[in-house]
């Protein structure tokens, strides 16, 4: 009977030992880990396009030219401040940046967002959406909405996953470990505004829904000392593994065996 033992476990990595198994079973486990575990991921992105005059006083965005005194405007639509001089009364922002929208959408899709399989459903099985056509599906029970509004700066400003805002409680925010993932760079006069919708999916359909990366397996190997004199020569070369790691002439620790193999391969080179 197959037995499973956890060798090591960290926040983002786990090593498992399978006994009495074969490659076919392990490959099936690998494929299921990568492609058949439900995960939330950004699937659609709506970009807001246009040019805006931002009020220096209240920071409100007005449609370009509408509020300017030279165009017959009456000022900011929020605080009614007069728009007479650019950079003094208002700042012009345009949704124009170097990276295409399609590439930004792809980057957003690959940013890990929290997955709560108990709080969210697949759109296909959502109680409120399952009977609707695909175009009409999407509700708070099966979708997570993120917004992004960011402005450039002189010399350039990198926009990251930290700038994404989840429309809900803090549990939906991008995890701290991934908040520095870059999305694009904005320069003076450039801005970006978008709404991103995340939904549940499987990695078999797209990599953005894959819950794991780099799932591999290899036969377990055990290192043994057959010649103490020759082994001493190796240990004197500053390997990460020493003789004290061997018990009864054998090294069974999976990670230490891997380190020994890497060290020996470098010596061979």
Language model segments and positions:
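Protein-protein interaction/assembly regions in multi-subunit complexes
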Residues: 1-59, 68, 72, 76-266
